[in-house]
Amino acid sequence: MTGQQLRAGLEGVTVAETRLSDIDGEAGELVVGGFPVETLATNATYEETVFLLLRDRLPTAEELAAFRTDLAERRGLSAEAHGVVRRAAKDGEPAMDALRMGLAAASLDADCADDRTTAKRVVAVVPTIVAAYWRYREGESPVEPDPELGHAEFGVRLDR
């Protein structure tokens, strides 16, 4: 190669520009949405962090309540999407492949008018798909989403 330097790995290569986060590897800092990740991990809920990533700011109390309700309403899977996940589990497909297939099937029955709506649907339905896949693999029926639970609690309880 004349005039070009071959680099191993991606060192020094810009893969993408983003406003969502910043990494200072030498200082050991990760900033997400303008906040050090340690601050978010200790002071923000999962829903607050997702809201921050979608809206570029933390939510008010009223916005957070509405966002939690919105996510809860988007958690369900259609019978067709369940069928895809059930078949993937029965056929022994790897979990990531089953998640990909489940997300594709879930997107067919969702009203995703824009990228933000699509992102909320993905965030909401991933725990439902993952838990359904593992329960189907064990020969069990999936647990229906509980809209009263926060998103993180919902995700943890689905596998029980």
Residue ranges and their predicted role:
Residues 1-160:
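Hydrophobic alpha-helical bundle cores within soluble ligand-binding/oligomerization subdomains
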